[in-house]
Amino acid sequence: MATNTFKQQVDSIIQSRHLLQHPFYIAWTEGKLTREQLRHYAEQYFYNVLAEPTYLSAVHFNTPHFHNVENSGDISIRQEVLKNLIDEEHGEKNHPALWKAFAFALGADDASLTQADALPETENLVATFRDICINEPFYAGLAALHAFESQVPDIAAVKIDGLAKFYGMKDPDSYEFFSVHQTADIFHSQAEWAIIEKFADTPEKQAEVLAATRRACDALWKFLDGIHENYCANLICEEKTAATLH
């Protein structure tokens, strides 16, 4: 498969499930969510924030040190994944800490973050990414990460704007998680794609990348379905009414 066609297929999968098209995020951009609904979202997504470093650890583990006939990969890939992992967990402003600052600004606390029962869709999100990153080749794991991180810069910009405009969140410390990812994930997703493009060099490997991309996008979409259906009944009623009127 030609490289440009392969990239187009990956991009098409991502665009068909782009998270900014989800009703929950649309409601966010329109200021229709309550702070309580956002808090529930923050508590649920915290499960994924804590799990993200383990996805990277799994890809790092699965990446061979050397490239040969039997194994594709090399130390440069391991180093790139390690840089991403360090970004996630190193220092006082590690990403779980930044997410906690966001959640606390919405009224959450340590107890609500650690004791919130994970929705089935939340459990599915974490389980799906872990399964791909642990049990599939490294380039498929990177495809799952790329499926999400390639969307994040646009999502983060919209979230920051909505938080300031509709929810009075104007302290940069409260939304630093998003501002950090708005920039960092441009580079992360570009690096991930460069590796995928280089090492998914057969039709079979490219098929694995496409399958991982679909699974990741579906799990992310279903996660927002879970938030929307469990915490946003008022919005669902409005949407059904609007659909009926049209």
UniProtKB/Swiss-Prot annotation:
EC number: 1.3.3.-
Iron found in the keyword field: yes
Site (Side-chain cleavage) location in chain: Y25
Cofactor mode of binding and number, as noted: Binds 2 divalent metal cations per subunit.
Keyword annotations from UniProtKB, A to Z: Iron, Metal-binding, Oxidoreductase
Alphabetized InterPro entries for the sequence: Fol-rel_CADD, Haem_Oase-like_multi-hlx, PqqC-like
Annotated signal sequence range: none
Binding site for Fe(2+) 1: E88, H95, H181
Residues that, per the record, bind Fe(2+) 2: E88, E149, D185, H188
Domain of life where this protein originates: Bacteria
GO molecular function: metal ion binding; oxidoreductase activity
Entry cofactors: Fe(2+); Mn(2+)
Additional note from the record: Can complement the PABA-auxotrophic E.coli mutant lacking pabA, pabB and pabC genes.
Assembly notes: Homodimer.
Family indicated by similarity: Belongs to the CADD family.
Function according to Swiss-Prot or TrEMBL: Involved in de novo para-aminobenzoate (PABA) biosynthesis. Acts as a self-sacrificing or 'suicide' enzyme that utilizes its own active site tyrosine residue(s) as the substrate for PABA synthesis. The side chain of the tyrosine residue is released from the protein backbone via cleavage of the C(alpha)-C(beta) bond, leaving a glycine in place of the original tyrosine residue. Reaction requires O(2) and a reduced dimetal cofactor.
NCBIfam families named among the record's database cross-references: fol_rel_CADD (TIGR04305)
Name this protein carries in UniProt: 4-aminobenzoate synthase
Source organism (scientific name): Nitrosomonas europaea (strain ATCC 19718 / CIP 103999 / KCTC 2705 / NBRC 14298)
Lineage: Bacteria, Pseudomonadati, Pseudomonadota, Betaproteobacteria, Nitrosomonadales
